[in-house]
Amino acid sequence: MLIALYLLSQTIAASGDWAAFDRGATCEAVSRSLLVPLKGDEQPRIAIAFDRGGPRRGEIGLHLHRAARPGSSVVLTVGDQPFLLSARGGDAWSRGPLQEAAIIAAIRRESGMRVEARDEAGRRMVDRYSLSGAPTAIDAAAARCSRKL
């Protein structure tokens, strides 16, 4: 389903391990984790979303390879800087504009990041991401959705 959605999107930039897409009302910088998912697991991915004329100006959304245990913490660590995210099921999000700005600034400085959580069975999950090309994709998505239609 996700792949079909991106096939309908216009690619506006691709650099390193990241790409930027224009999906009409929203533009996103996206990447998938370095993890090759096991059978039954999903491909972890991150999207940094910008709305054209809307409220999202760099919202970070992650999809984990398994659902997080209810009430557990999901921590995104960019370089050595940790960020506590909001989570429900297999998804996690940034907590607001100040945190989003701090995460994006850290992504620009670092070469890698990881997401850690506990799954519903209590097992530790770690998803790792390359940040090669992230600044280019983020800038392209932000610039495209800042244009007036």
PLM feature spans:
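A generic "folded-domain core" signal
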Residues: 2, 6-149
